[in-house]
From Swiss-Prot:
Functional note: Has antibacterial activity against Gram-positive bacterium P.citreus.
Keywords in alphabetical order: Antibiotic, Antimicrobial, Secreted
Name by which UniProt lists this protein: Oncorhyncin-1
Organism: Oncorhynchus mykiss
GO cellular component terms attached to this protein's record: extracellular region
Source domain of life: Eukaryota
Tissue specificity comment: Skin.
Source species taxonomy: Eukaryota, Metazoa, Chordata, Craniata, Vertebrata
Length: 15
């Protein structure tokens, strides 16, 4: 759950 949220945050910041 935490990893998934962090992954989404990272992807959003990268995008």
């Amino acid at each position: 759950s935490k990893g998934k949220k962090a992954n989404k945050d990272v992807e959003l910041a990268r995008g």
